[in-house]
């Protein structure tokens, strides 16, 4: 890449970054937080944060990258995607009408809410316990990270339930919403994330997500400033780099350490070059249609229920890894959101996907606002926990693609909804057995005086 070519790419990158950052800033000034702000920051991180890192790798370490015209296509496709997404998100689908009382879909009380977070936490802890009994601490047993996907590791399906510890702790926080509950959320979820990091053998997702939710709650409540958020972001990048070194068993120093930091940080936070690789091989892609979305559900079907279930699922990530990169190491390389759309239907699917994503984020913001307006604090805690708990799925959306997002968000909704139903059933059983005693003002006054 020549300096002239780099200059052209830099101008396009700068314009796209300023365009998205400006719209995000105006939205932040208007509402302080919603899921459009979160997704916009996540989109910036995924598709534009990596460009400076790639540039340093090219000019400092002479690393090979896709041709400049392909990198230009990647930047422009990301910018156009966001423009279509933003217009879709801001388009009002129906006339604003005055709020009229409606019969609520469901209600929550104190006991049901506490039962819900206990069940969610129980699912996570029991899953971790069973996985640990089968495999021990994989971080200290395995020689390479790719081995966690091998037949040596049993009970892999249990990992999908680990994440429900975070929604459980979110319910606990939203019931109190003070600084102590905020700090308790951080300590408990990061401690759980470090435990799963050691047990699973290097998975950092729970730590990243817990830290991100902690920061956004702090921004919403005014407990941290934007400068503190930026400093925490830098600290998070350094922390993820250190965990990656431990995961891969790397011991580096000097120029090698700087080089390793650049490419690991790029691959962890901003795999935008993967989109460029897909565009470079565009003519060789056999478009998969909507099949990757259907196939991604296969991993949630137990083998005893479907004996002939394919052991290897050809979703967009695996198609990119196996067919485009010819990589059969056992790891799935993230194709990114736009890359998954390219695998499914080529360039035509990019604006269509942007419209779908705009509607998805719009739905989450509708739920979030519903929680903000809800007078029942127990129901509000459940709604907010669901919305913030889905942040993991939004990260999957940006990094892994639309197919992975759909299967995971459906799984999340089913498990979360099942926990709600079980909590309500248990409450009904306890109440029928006479074990539930409603609090009254007189009893509370007696307790205080005693």
UniProtKB/Swiss-Prot annotation:
* Signal peptide location: none
Please state the protein's primary subcellular location.
Answer: membrane
UniProt pathway annotation: Bacterial outer membrane biogenesis; enterobacterial common antigen biosynthesis
What InterPro entries would the database entry show? WzyE
Q: Does the keyword Nucleotide-binding apply?
A: no
Instruction: Tell me which Gene Ontology terms the entry assigns under biological process.
Output: enterobacterial common antigen biosynthetic process
Q: Where in the cell is it found?
A: Cell inner membrane
Which positions, given as ranges, span the membrane? 6-26, 37-57, 63-83, 118-138, 155-175, 181-201, 207-227, 228-248, 341-361, 378-398, 410-430
Bilayer topology? Multi-pass membrane protein
Q: Which HAMAP family match?
A: WzyE
Q: How does it assemble?
A: Probably part of a complex composed of WzxE, WzyE and WzzE.
The family line of this record is: Belongs to the WzyE family.
What name does UniProt use for this protein? Probable ECA polymerase
**Species classification:** Bacteria, Pseudomonadati, Pseudomonadota, Gammaproteobacteria, Enterobacterales
């Amino acid at each position: 890449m020549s300096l002239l070519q780099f200059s052209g790419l830099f101008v396009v990158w700068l314009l796209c970054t300023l365009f998205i950052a400006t719209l995000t800033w105006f939205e932040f000034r208007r509402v302080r937080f919603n899921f459009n702000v979160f997704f916009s920051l996540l989109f910036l991180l995924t598709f534009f944060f990596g460009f400076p890192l790639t540039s340093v790798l090219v000019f400092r370490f002479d690393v090979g990258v896709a041709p400049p015209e392909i990198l230009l296509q990647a930047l422009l496709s990301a910018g156009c995607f966001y423009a279509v997404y933003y217009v879709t998100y801001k388009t009002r689908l129906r006339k604003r009408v005055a709020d009229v009382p409606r019969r609520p879909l469901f209600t929550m009380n104190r006991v049901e809410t506490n039962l819900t977070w206990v069940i969610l936490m129980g699912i996570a802890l029991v899953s971790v316990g069973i996985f640990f009994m089968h495999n021990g601490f994989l971080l200290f047993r395995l020689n390479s990270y790719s081995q966690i996907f091998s037949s040596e590791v049993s009970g892999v399906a249990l990992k999908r339930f680990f994440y429900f510890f975070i929604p459980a702790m979110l319910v606990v926080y939203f019931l109190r919403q003070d600084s102590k509950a905020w700090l308790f959320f951080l300590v408990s979820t990061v401690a759980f994330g470090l435990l799963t990091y050691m047990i699973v053998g290097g998975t950092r997702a729970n730590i990243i997500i817990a830290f991100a939710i902690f920061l956004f709650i702090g921004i919403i409540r005014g407990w941290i400033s934007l400068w503190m958020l930026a400093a925490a972001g830098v600290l998070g990048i350094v922390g993820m780099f250190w965990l990656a070194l431990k995961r891969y068993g790397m011991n580096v120093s000097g120029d090698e350490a700087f080089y390793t930091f650049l490419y690991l940080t790029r691959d962890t936070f901003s795999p935008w070059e993967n989109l460029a690789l897909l565009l470079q091989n565009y003519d060789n892609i056999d478009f998969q249609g909507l099949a990757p979305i259907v196939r991604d559900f296969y991993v949630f079907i137990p083998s005893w229920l479907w004996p002939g279930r394919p052991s290897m699922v050809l979703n967009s990530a695996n198609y990119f890894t196996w067919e485009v990169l010819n990589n059969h190491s056992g790891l799935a390389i993230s194709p990114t959101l736009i890359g998954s759309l390219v695998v499914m239907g080529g360039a035509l699917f990019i604006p269509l996907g942007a419209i779908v994503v705009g509607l998805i984020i719009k739905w989450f913001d509708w739920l979030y606002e519903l929680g903000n307006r809800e007078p029942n604090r127990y129901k509000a805690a459940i709604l907010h926990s669901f919305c913030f708990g889905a942040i993991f799925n939004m990260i999957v959306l940006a990094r892994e693609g639309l197919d992975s997002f759909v299967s995971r968000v459906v799984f999340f909704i089913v498990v979360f909804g099942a926990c709600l139903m079980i909590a309500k059933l248990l409450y009904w059983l306890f109440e029928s057995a006479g074990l539930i005693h409603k609090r009254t003002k007189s009893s509370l006054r007696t307790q205080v005086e005693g």
